[in-house]
Amino acid sequence: MADGIDRRADDKMEFNTSKEVTVAPTFEDMHLKESLLRGIYAYGYESPSAVQSRAIVQICKGRDTIAQAQSGTGKTATFSISALQVIDTVVRETQALVLSPTRELATQIQSVIMALGDYMNVQCHACIGGTNIGEDIRKLDYGQHVVSGTPGRVADMIRRRHLRTRHIKMLVLDEADELLNRGFREQIYDVYRYLPPATQVVVVSATLPYDVLDMTTKFMTDPVRVLVKRDELTLEGIKQYFIAVEKEEWKFDTLCDLYDTLTITQAVIFCNTRRKVDWLTDKMREANFTVSSMHGEMPQKERDSIMQDFRQGNSRVLISTDVWARGIDVQQVSLVINYDLPTNRENYIHRIGRSGRFGRKGVAINFVTSDDVRILRDIELYYSTQIDEMPMNVADLLS
């Protein structure tokens, strides 16, 4: 599993896919540039995952594409490889634009593109809010083949004419369900309006609710679809449990009781609001527990340093809002705790997908008050899954 994908689970994935989509069993069968193939193998990929073997060829043909697959199945590499195949590195202009809902995800995508394009002399810039605008302007004026960014900063740079759009061939919307949620919808339209009419659109996400699929009709032409059936979307290899806590006030004591279990590997604890993250972090520290925390209101430098500490394993328990839930890849995370159940059932799968990355075993524990029982049942029904009461030996499941 050097390439980080669980092949057994991958082989069992069911695809509900457009008829014209063929399967390319190897990267060589995709007729990719030699320099790109070298980068793919150097990155640790040996053969394409299920979603890669179906989607890359279609995207490289220039087809508008909707690709849906579980977390940890190589979705980021799917569009990164495709973008690197279609760009011409001789032309130092932006030719592919990737939009993501969080700064951390945009930065991670940039690092994947740089690694896969290592032998291509590719220029890729992360254009994200909370960073120095002067640096953005300098990098963009120099010329970037690929820009990976958040919608607000990208729209701003286009309006200021530092991000030149006339050579853009491909727009990728990653975690499209979140991007197209109300918060980013207008900014995406802002960006889209500036792109050449022939721009290819690629939509990628673990969940694609029907309203998102409906919205894509506005800016996609006859898209090819590579969709996993929803019944297949519960993340295999992740055991899901709940703890009945009756009252909100009891959650804190329950978490303290679990702390020794959390630190066996690394754990992420999700709360629904920034204020709750700050409150819980303070409470845990007052009780002499070591935790770190992150949410969208923190300065970007602080968020970067917290992410780096967590990635390197220097901090073991991270308390966060959903800013962390989407696509962030930290391979050691084996445990996710939903201190609050997510208000949006699509976010449930993004959160628990943080544990068990790339086919490792993971555990997700949901704190459920009497008010939450209905939400939990709704999640079970929506994903055709079963969430059991947590057993006493949860530590054994993690070790």
From Swiss-Prot:
One GO term describing the cellular component: nucleolus
Enzyme Commission number, as recorded: 3.6.4.13
Catalyzed chemical reaction(s): ATP + H2O = ADP + phosphate + H(+)
EC class: hydrolase
Keyword Isomerase (UniProt): no
InterPro entries for this protein: DEAD/DEAH_box_helicase_dom, Helicase_ATP-bd, Helicase_C-like, P-loop_NTPase, RNA-helicase_DEAD-box_CS, RNA_helicase_DEAD_Q_motif
Gene Ontology biological process: mRNA splicing, via spliceosome; rRNA processing
Domain Helicase C-terminal: 237-398
Name of one Pfam family that matches: DEAD
Motif (Q motif): 25-53
Keyword Cell membrane: no
Residues that hold ATP according to the record: A69, Q70, S71, G72, T73, G74, K75, T76
Location of the motif DEAD box: 174-177
GO molecular function, one term: mRNA binding
Domain Helicase ATP-binding: 56-226
Compartments it resides in: Nucleus, Nucleolus
Keywords: ATP-binding, Helicase, Hydrolase, Nucleotide-binding, Nucleus, Ribosome biogenesis, RNA-binding, rRNA processing
Matches recorded under SMART domains: DEXDc (SM00487), HELICc (SM00490)
Protein family according to the UniProt entry: Belongs to the DEAD box helicase family. DDX48/FAL1 subfamily.
Domain comment (free text): The Q motif is unique to and characteristic of the DEAD box family of RNA helicases and controls ATP binding and hydrolysis.
Role played: ATP-dependent RNA helicase involved in 40S ribosomal subunit biogenesis. Required for the processing and cleavage of 35S pre-rRNA at sites A0, A1, and A2, leading to mature 18S rRNA.
Protein name listed in UniProt: ATP-dependent RNA helicase fal1
Organism: Emericella nidulans (strain FGSC A4 / ATCC 38163 / CBS 112.46 / NRRL 194 / M139)
Gene name in the database record: fal1
